[in-house]
UniProtKB/Swiss-Prot annotation:
InterPro entries: PSII_PsbK, PSII_PsbK_sf. It comes from Cyanophora paradoxa. It is found in: Plastid, Cyanelle thylakoid membrane. GO terms for biological process: photosynthesis. PSII is composed of 1 copy each of membrane proteins PsbA, PsbB, PsbC, PsbD, PsbE, PsbF, PsbH, PsbI, PsbJ, PsbK, PsbL, PsbM, PsbT, PsbX, PsbY, PsbZ, Psb30/Ycf12, at least 3 peripheral proteins of the oxygen-evolving complex and a large number of cofactors. It forms dimeric complexes. SUPFAM superfamilies: Photosystem II reaction center protein K, PsbK. This is Photosystem II reaction center protein K. The gene is psbK. Pfam families: PsbK (PF02533). NCBIfam families: PRK02553.1 (NF002715). The lineage of its organism: Eukaryota, Glaucocystophyceae, Cyanophoraceae, Cyanophora.
Length: 45
């Protein structure tokens, strides 16, 4: 009972993190872009 009550409150507790969760899938794309820019900066050696 206590566990189900805790789980029921989780969505409200995590509502604060929704913007972060929306951004998370984009982060690997930033790493790919960073790698490309880094290679361009050193001249694709």
């Amino acid at each position: 009972m206590l566990m189900s009550l805790f789980l029921a409150k989780l969505p409200a507790a995590y509502a604060l993190f929704d913007p972060i969760v929306d951004i998370l899938p984009i982060i690997p794309l930033f790493f790919l872009l960073l790698a490309f820019v880094w290679q361009a900066a050193i001249g694709f050696k």
